[in-house]
Amino acid sequence: MPRIDISRLPDESRIWIFGISPALDKPKSLRLLSLVDRFLDDWSAHGQAIVSARDLLHGSFLVIAVDQQSETSGCSIDRMFGLLRQLESELGVVILDPNRIFYQDGSGKVATMTRPEFVENGRQDMVVFDILAERIGRIRRGLWQKPARDSWHGALIRQAS
């Protein structure tokens, strides 16, 4: 079976993190995970099953991970993005918006701003989520959550100064 529990993947495993806005409630979370599981169970590249896993963090971040021994292809990645477009439509959420910045608000909840809003209102001490992280080990070590000043997000704020 190509889909495994994400905890079984090594830290070097390739990941894609997709921010979801608004955050999913329990029924939508379950629906999303069901559709993603079905996709991952059949995901392949050049006829070879892709050993993969998924997780949903904070109800706002879909993580898709691939074992480093599996090879993806342009077509297999395109199919993954097709799934994401389907999820957006079916669940009434935004997943593929590159202009969304995800951060932790004052109460510790995940919130979003557009990139222009972040340039205007972001602060260097805001905890942001780096959805560009490429290895699962970065999530496990908490390196994808950090103050904006320690991330590429800080440069957006500096540009506005």
Predicted regions and their residues:
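Short, intrinsically disordered low-complexity segments
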Residues: A49-V66, S70
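Helix-adjacent hinge/juxtasegments
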Residues: I64-I95
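Terminal interaction module
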Residues: G92, L96-S161
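Residues that form generic nucleotide/phosphate-binding pockets
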Residues: L35, F39, E90, N121
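Ordered hydrophobic segments in well-structured contexts
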Residues: I15-G19, F61-A65, F102
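Long, hydrophobic N-terminal alpha-helical segment
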Residues: I4, D11-L56
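Short Gly/Ser/Thr- and Asp/Glu-enriched loop/turn motifs at secondary-structure junctions
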Residues: D11-S13, L56-F61, L96-N99
